[in-house]
UniProtKB/Swiss-Prot annotation:
Protein name: N-myc proto-oncogene protein
Gene source species: Serinus canaria
SMART domains (alphabetical): HLH
Top-level taxonomic group: Eukaryota
A molecular-function term among this protein's GO annotations: protein dimerization activity
Amino acid sequence: MPGMVSKNPDLEFDSLQPCFYPDEDDFYLCGPDSAPPGEDIWKKFELLPTPPLSPSRPAPGAPSGRGPGAVGRSGSVGLPHDPVDWASELLLLPPEADLWGGMDGGDFFETGPGVTNNLNSIIIQDCMWSGFSAREKLERAVTEKLQNKTPAAPPPPPGTAGSPPVPARSGRAVPECVDPAVVFPFPVNKREAPAAEGLRRRRRARGDSRASSSSSSSGDDTLSDSEDDEDEEEEDEEEEIDVVTVEKRRSSTNKSVTTLTITVRPNNTTFSSVRTQQNGLILKRCAPIHQQHNYAAPSPFVETEESPPQKKLKVEVSRPVKPTIQPKLKSSSPRNSDSEDSERRRNHNILERQRANDLRSSFLTLRDHVLSELVQNEKAAKVVILKKATEYVHSLQAEEQKLLLEKEKLQARQEQLLKKIDYKRTC
């Protein structure tokens, strides 16, 4: 931020001036090259004052000291006399103090002598918190600055009427800060920082004890103790777990596998053989788990190795049988098929010739014996012969009908004659 202001001082310095103290470069006691740029930025965020137009909160000691019209730009709002005092009030307080004014602690903005404040209330556990290293460096710088400035600051004279007392001076910084309940209404866990510190100390102690136990114990003892340390290894897997074992454990989360994961640093050469043996054990024990999760694949390795030879034997047994039977069938079937085809062709040709001869002879008979008109016409077409034959058939049918009628008449006449003969005999 100072670099940005120095690049464009005419345009941006006036708008950004309320966000910085006038002597912040002297306050931090460090140049741009003394610390990494990230930590310098986080320090500025830690000590960033409240924006000018934020809602005011009067101190309990001076309720009518400042009116609402007094809160304006940074020129109208009075800054504390010493920014080092303001930073020390924020940083050099016990971490057990409650931000929201709990039962055992005071308020964050009550800067009385017997009131405790929470260190986490600076940014309310913001995600951009720089960490413990930056906090320790900042506390060290603040303490050194306080030791240097405390003898130089003259005490205010008691007789002057314009100089306010000490609690009033500390209370003047209250309207410049925002009530966290207005901006961030969610409750903050009171024991977050001590719990986090205790958890990290516990993890470090566990890592030290685990390293010492792994150096003293052998591979078999560590295999028996691996089930008890599985939960602890999951907590420290970012620092102490091998890559191969992480992948195997993720794949085998459903089934408990007694595997050992020892973190061996490259300087230690005594546990290299133990680590290789453990890696071999892990690979051997986790391999069937992949097969069990894959339901389509055959379950064990031994059965899969034995089953393909059986299939090959079956195929090899069936293959020799087919070539022995098929050549005989092929050798016999072509000859039989050829002979049968030749016989069928011969029979078919003979039958076709006989049919053609019969048809020709029938046409010739029709032409010569039935159709007297076409006897001398040897080149008459079959169609003409068939037409003439049909006409002849129809004529024959007509004659048949006539003859039948005559027959009926004759039979009726015969009956009449027979009746007459019988009548005459009787008479």
